[in-house]
Amino acid sequence: MKSIVYMLLFCTFTVVILGHPNDHGALIPYRAEKLPNGEWCIRPGYSCSERGQCCMPVDGDTYTYGCGRAWSEGSKVCFICNRESSMC
């Protein structure tokens, strides 16, 4: 029983420390499209180098997208967030 509790704590801390793609809007509907270079767009929560690589949200009036640094990660990641949110 003790080992199960330790395993659950380890998994919880791992998700908290490393983050999860859902933190970047992965649950918000987005368009998975092919880019002009033939590659697929990058999903929210995954590494990118510029905004043009990221998948766009289906509802562009409510949501915006981009490629930026997350507080918990050193690299840039794609994100989708609500335009009215102060966290965007």
UniProtKB/Swiss-Prot annotation:
This is Toxin ICK-12. Belongs to the neurotoxin 27 (Jztx-72) family. ICK-41 subfamily. InterPro entries: Cys_Knot_tox. Expressed by the venom gland. Probable neurotoxin with ion channel impairing activity. The keyword Magnesium does not apply. Pfam families: Cys_Knot_tox. Residues 1-19 form the signal peptide. One of its GO terms (molecular function) is ion channel regulator activity.
